[in-house]
């Protein structure tokens, strides 16, 4: 697929190829390589925490699974941002070539993350009488994301809703160990 190409699976589900240089929803606060290094540090910290939790044996399986799914999703996004730009040429107006002779479109740690899942659940137009947005297109659930993003978001939601106490216990223990 070329950049911004899409395939309609259903009216409410599309495969839509974009490259995201930032964080969730394309937010870009820092350079890509700084973001990638930050992701690597966070994933390392989460991995150490999972190891400690399993070693202690005091937490429920669902809690460990949720942390592991966050780790897996974040690792997937890191792999994408570290290697995608090195292994592929740009996708503007063409299908990206794998291992191009001239090299990829980005240097190591400066690649983008491929997002492709789009769920435009409601597509309509704002009524013309509506101030500011009148007559403009309205799409409910506009974000485009990937499986790794889903893994991170769903697992974070599960942790906050069902394992909040366990999460705070780990953070408090980590803070106590630092002092």
Predicted regions and their residues:
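Alpha-helical transmembrane bundles and membrane-interface segments of multipass inner-membrane proteins
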Residues: 1-179
């Amino acid at each position: 697929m070329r950049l911004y190409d899409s395939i309609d699976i259903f009216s409410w589900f599309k495969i839509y190829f974009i490259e995201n240089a930032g964080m969730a929803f394309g937010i870009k606060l820092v350079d890509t390589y700084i973001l990638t290094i930050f992701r690597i540090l966070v994933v390392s910290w989460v991995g150490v925490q999972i190891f400690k939790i399993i070693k202690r044996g005091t937490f429920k399986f669902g809690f460990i699974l949720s942390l592991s799914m966050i780790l897996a999703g974040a690792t997937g996004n890191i792999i994408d941002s570290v290697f995608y730009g090195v292994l592929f040429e740009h996708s503007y107006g063409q299908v990206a070539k794998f291992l191009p002779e001239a090299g990829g479109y980005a240097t190591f740690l400066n690649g983008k993350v491929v997002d492709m899942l789009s769920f435009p659940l409601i597509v309509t137009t704002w009524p013309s009488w509506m101030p500011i947005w009148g007559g403009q297109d309205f799409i409910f659930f506009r974000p485009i994301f990937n499986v790794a993003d889903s893994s991170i978001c769903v697992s974070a939601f599960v942790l906050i809703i069902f394992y909040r106490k366990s999460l705070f216990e780990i953070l408090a223990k980590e803070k106590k160990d630092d002092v």
